[in-house]
């Protein structure tokens, strides 16, 4: 069947009715957005001669994504999260807001309310016999290189098995999640465990979509950050650990050139020992630059 009816007056009038454009109530912007989305989908059905069977198969997949709470997982896989970053980068460039550590995607696994500590935090509440001890630290400064005392550094990551607290019910709440207030020189420090990379669940709805596209669903080992300070632009970012096979092949498109960090094995690290962290550690250093701004809305999480 090669029927094409999208451009007919009947279909165009029908689209306006479906989107509520003939009604006085509702939200005008919402109507325009729905009209655009429906128009593009209707045209796609025409252009690719999508059958009723194929349509209902897609509906079943959407239902499965919802039941598995995987829309937040598929979103970065289809590039939506990175596209939003690209738009924010373009807005910064247009406003001549330059410099600072690059942003990258937040991901769906942030949980507010992590315990707060001054200068140093131990993040690993749960034993992780397979995990390497991580000594994670860095300095928060402005684009002129001046330290930012009191900067708020929120950090979260998975354990050595790829699970996140709250989502992996075997973990203590807020395991591997902390908020650290940088010291008078802008430094933050944490003891934790080296996270592992992980993939989307085999056979899950997200995996089905990615396989349809001939793509994998793997993420490298990575660590998430929110960083904020008065008078500076809020930063959402993450670092991928160098040496992971997917460091530069992240299905979520989160890798950026300046956001890969090396892990270095150190015996009896002197600075770590000052905070009670003994033995062999894997040191990961991530220094952060925040861009100055007087706009209050840019100082908060987008």
From Swiss-Prot:
Question: Could you list the residue ranges that cross the membrane?
Answer: none
The record's EC number reads: 1.13.11.1
Task: List the cofactors.
Answer: Fe(3+)
Q: Does the record bear Oxidoreductase in its keywords?
A: yes
- Quote one Gene Ontology molecular function term: ferric iron binding
Q: Which residues form the signal peptide?
A: none
Which reactions is this enzyme annotated as catalysing?
catechol + O2 = cis,cis-muconate + 2 H(+)
* Entry keywords, A to Z: Aromatic hydrocarbons catabolism, Dioxygenase, Iron, Metal-binding, Oxidoreductase, Plasmid
Q: Which residues are noted in the entry as Fe cation-binding?
A: 164, 198, 222, 224
| Highest taxon in the source lineage | Bacteria
Its annotated pathway? Aromatic compound metabolism; beta-ketoadipate pathway; 5-oxo-4,5-dihydro-2-furylacetate from catechol: step 1/3
Q: Does the keyword Oxidoreductase apply?
A: yes
Enzymatic class: oxidoreductase
GO BP terms, alphabetized: beta-ketoadipate pathway; catechol-containing compound catabolic process
Binding note for cofactor? Binds 1 Fe(3+) ion per subunit.
Alphabetical list of InterPro entries matching this protein: Catechol_dOase_N (IPR007535), Cchol_dOase_prob (IPR012801), Intradiol_dOase_C (IPR000627), Intradiol_dOase_core (IPR015889), Intradiol_RC_Dioxygenase (IPR050770)
**SUPFAM superfamilies for this protein:** Aromatic compound dioxygenase
Return the similarity comment. Answer: Belongs to the intradiol ring-cleavage dioxygenase family.
Protein name, entry field: Catechol 1,2-dioxygenase
């Amino acid at each position: 069947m090669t029927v094409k009816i999208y451009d007919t007056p009947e279909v165009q009038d029908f689209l306006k009715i479906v989107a509520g454009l003939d009604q006085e109530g509702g939200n005008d912007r919402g109507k325009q957005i729905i009209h655009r989305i429906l128009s593009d989908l209707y045209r796609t059905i025409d252009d690719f001669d999508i059958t009723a069977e194929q349509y209902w198969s897609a509906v079943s997949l959407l239902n499965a994504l919802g039941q598995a709470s995987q829309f937040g997982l598929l979103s970065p896989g289809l590039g939506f999260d990175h596209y939003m970053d690209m738009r924010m980068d373009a807005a910064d460039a247009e406003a001549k807001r330059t410099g600072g550590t690059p942003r990258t995607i937040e991901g769906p696994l942030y949980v507010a309310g992590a315990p707060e500590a001054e200068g140093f935090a131990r993040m690993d509440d749960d034993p992780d016999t397979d995990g390497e001890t991580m000594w994670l630290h860095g300095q928060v400064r402005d684009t002129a290189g001046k330290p930012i005392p009191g900067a708020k550094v929120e950090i979260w990551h998975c354990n050595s098995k790829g699970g996140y607290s709250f989502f992996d019910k075997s973990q203590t709440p807020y395991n591997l999640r902390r908020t650290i207030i940088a010291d008078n020189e802008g430094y933050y420090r944490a003891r934790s465990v080296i996270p592992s990379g992980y993939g989307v669940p085999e056979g899950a709805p997200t995996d089905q979509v990615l396989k349809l596209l001939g793509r994998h669903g793997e993420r490298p080992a990575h660590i998430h950050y929110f960083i904020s300070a008065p008078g500076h632009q809020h930063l959402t970012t993450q670092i991928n650990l160098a040496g992971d096979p997917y460091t530069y092949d992240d299905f979520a498109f989160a890798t950026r050139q300046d956001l890969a960090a090396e892990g270095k094995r150190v015996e009896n690290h002197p600075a770590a020992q000052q905070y009670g962290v003994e033995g062999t550690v894997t040191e990961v250093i991530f220094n952060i630059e925040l861009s100055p701004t007087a706009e209050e809305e840019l100082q908060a999480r987008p």
